[in-house]
Curated annotation (Swiss-Prot):
<dbReference type="InterPro" id="IPR000559">
    <property type="entry name" value="Formate_THF_ligase"/>
</dbReference>
<keyword id="KW-0554">One-carbon metabolism</keyword>
<feature type="binding site">
    <location>
        <begin position="66"/>
        <end position="73"/>
    </location>
    <ligand>
        <name>ATP</name>
    </ligand>
</feature>
<dbReference type="GO" id="GO:0035999">
    <property type="term" value="P:tetrahydrofolate interconversion"/>
</dbReference>
<keyword id="KW-0067">ATP-binding</keyword>
<dbReference type="InterPro" id="IPR027417">
    <property type="entry name" value="P-loop_NTPase"/>
</dbReference>
<comment type="pathway">
    <text>One-carbon metabolism; tetrahydrofolate interconversion.</text>
</comment>
<protein>
    <recommendedName>
        <fullName>Formate--tetrahydrofolate ligase 3</fullName>
        <ecNumber>6.3.4.3</ecNumber>
    </recommendedName>
</protein>
<dbReference type="Pfam" id="PF01268">
    <property type="entry name" value="FTHFS"/>
</dbReference>
<keyword id="KW-0547">Nucleotide-binding</keyword>
<dbReference type="GO" id="GO:0005524">
    <property type="term" value="F:ATP binding"/>
</dbReference>
<dbReference type="GO" id="GO:0004329">
    <property type="term" value="F:formate-tetrahydrofolate ligase activity"/>
</dbReference>
<keyword id="KW-0436">Ligase</keyword>
<dbReference type="InterPro" id="IPR020628">
    <property type="entry name" value="Formate_THF_ligase_CS"/>
</dbReference>
<comment type="similarity">
    <text>Belongs to the formate--tetrahydrofolate ligase family.</text>
</comment>
């Protein structure tokens, strides 16, 4: 089979104006082309399209993934393409790629095989410059903070309390912890700081959650960068940095329009970290996309306990949109890993025994699948399982997954969209169509599921944390470090108690221990500290060790990426 890059490069793409017209977007009013195959979509489209019918809203989530990922983006793309094979129109909405992982071990974020967003080089490298704008806006605030300290510190900011570091879109472990302001007195105030990757910036989370340019400006002003000598929070507005940040982001808030290999419209916008932020694409992309097709399909990072929970309880609160169904992507290899009998490591070959026929291990690991389906249903949303099929799978293993899904009342579809494109996900599209129609019929009869949040915003922060830990992760309790309890009390006093919570934990387990596979029981969630993203609008407790600046592997993808003699990119995947 051809590589992802070879497949993408061989595609015949539609002019982006034609893609926009298929969505009801007008070239002269709504589209700002960036070349022939990418365009920005003006936010006036939200109002202009508001009288059009709403699409059915589908979330693509997954079981707890292995370090290799289980194919959510590929499934999102394949499903979007599949609907056209059954006479329906679809728009997909996905996150923007970060160049750090693209040059690291993870690779790009355009999907794969015959289910990709194209041009894939554009998506994975720069696109329209949104990540650079986020980087510049973030670092502008960092410069304003240090400039304020240098010029007398009129706000009385405690330098040790400053939590606003700098960012860049490169995996570079050597910048995690640095000392700034060294040299002469004129070189600034020395203090310890560091760099995070751009996707971990609160500015990126704000870009994803802002519902308008005005909302973006307000959220930027609410960013808390530290506290003063009296212990009161100091904001980006206080250091007079928010206005300049908004100017830098004025174009970045507009979603990017691209297309799949089969011409399905793709809105590509924002890329917040899935660990410490929502891991979802932007609210504005969904507000536009929901009026452009019969189905709007979006994805959420990592497993249903992570991205989907945040999608439901954070993103949907802001957008006001309610999902009609969710897909839980599962693979045979990941479910075998969840049996606890295999180890999968990023960058290492798969264990040979993992590829042998073993439906018993699939069933053992399927406890994770069943819990993730339950996590979707907790929110009143029906779930359909997508088996992302690999050539090494066996029919008996697919049957084991189908049996596990049936136990918890979920339909199941085997998908081969990686090798077949949209045709390979038609079974999934039909299963979703039937599931949504069935749920609507049940609702009309007084039954069926209705979308609901897991907790009310009035609930105290501590209780919100414990609700997620118990109901979503399956923990029997929560243990707090003293520092975490003090932070929670401080946030309640500061008026942040009505914010939703976004628990930062490993994506490799339902628990906070990446080594615990399946659906572990009898464990307690440990919260060691709690931080606030007040601008983005959530509190994030830290559970376990979180890296916000990745490092490169011994042999990163960057070693293989180059230009050929004709100036074409080679080695990108």
């Amino acid at each position: 089979m051809l590589t992802n890059l070879e497949i993408a490069r061989g595609a015949k793409l539609l002019p982006i104006e034609e893609v926009g017209r298929s969505m009801g977007l007008r070239e002269e009013r709504h589209l700002e082309p960036y070349g022939r195959h990418v365009a920005k979509v003006d936010l006036c489209a939200i109002e202009d399209l508001s009288e059009r019918p709403k699409a059915k809203y589908i979330l693509v989530s997954a079981i707890t993934p292995t370090p290799l990922g289980e194919g959510k983006t590929t499934t999102t793309v394949g499903l979007g393409q599949a609907f056209s094979h059954i006479g329906k129109r679809a728009t997909i909405a996905i996150r923007q790629a970060s160049m750090g992982p693209a040059f690291g071990i993870k690779g790009g974020a355009a999907g794969g095989g015959y289910s990709q967003v194209v041009p894939m080089e554009r998506l994975n490298l720069h696109l329209t410059g949104d990540l650079h704008a986020v980087t510049e806006a973030h670092n502008m605030l960092a410069a304003m903070i240090d400039n304020h300290l240098y010029h007398g510190n009129g706000l009385g900011i405690e330098p040790h309390s400053i939590s606003w570091r700098r960012v860049m879109d490169v995996n570079d472990r050597s910048l995690r912890n640095i000392v700034i302001g060294l040299g002469a007195r004129t070189d600034g105030v020395p203090r310890q700081s560091g760099f995070d990757i751009t996707a971990a910036s609160e500015v990126m989370a704000i870009l994803a959650l802002a519902s308008s340019l005005e909302d973006l400006r307000e959220r930027l002003g609410r960013i808390v960068i530290g506290h003063n000598r009296e212990g009161n929070p100091v904001s980006a507005e206080d250091v007079r940095g928010a206005g300049a940040m908004a100017v830098i982001l004025k174009e970045a808030i507009k979603p990017n329009l691209m297309q799949t290999l089969e011409g399905t419209p793709a809105l590509v916008h924002a890329g917040p970290f899935g660990n410490i932020a929502t891991g979802n694409s932007s609210v504005v992309a969904d507000l536009i996309g929901i009026r452009t097709a019969d189905y709007l399909i979006t994805e959420a990072g990592f497993g249903a306990d992570m991205g989907a929970e945040r999608f439901f309880n954070i993103k949907c609160r802001i957008s006001g949109l309610e999902p009609d169904a969710a897909v839980v992507v599962a693979t045979v290899r990941a479910l075998k890993a969840h049996s606890g009998r295999y180890q999968i490591k990023a960058g290492a070959p798969l264990p040979e025994e993992l590829l042998e026929e073993n439906p018993q291990d699939v069933l053992a690991g399927a406890e994770n699948l069943k819990k993730q389906i339950e996590n979707i249903k907790l929110h009143g949303v029906p779930a359909v399982v997508a088996i992302n099929a690999f050539p090494t799978d066996h029919p008996s293993e697919h049957k084991a997954i189908e049996e596990a899904a049936k136990e918890v009342g979920a339909r199941c579809a085997v998908c081969r969209h990686f090798t077949e494109g949209g045709k390979g996900a038609v079974e999934l599209a039909r299963a979703l169509e039937e599931t949504i129609e069935e749920n609507e019929r049940e609702r009309r009869r007084g039954g069926g599921g209705s979308f609901r949040f897991l907790y009310p915003l009035e609930m105290p922060l501590k209780q919100k944390i414990e609700t997620i830990a118990r109901e979503v992760y399956g923990a029997e309790g929560v243990e707090y470090d003293a520092e975490a309890l003090r932070a929670l009390e401080g946030f309640e006093r500061a008026g942040f108690g009505r914010l939703p919570v976004c628990l930062a934990k490993t994506h490799l387990s339902l628990s906070s221990d990446p080594a615990l596979k399946g659906a572990p029981r009898g464990w307690k969630l440990s919260v060691r500290e709690v931080r606030a993203s007040v601008g983005a609008g959530f509190i994030y407790p830290i559970c376990g060790q979180m890296r916000t600046m990745p490092g490169l592997s011994a042999h990163p993808a960057a070693e293989r990426i180059d230009l050929d003699g004709e100036g074409n990119v080679v080695g990108l995947f």
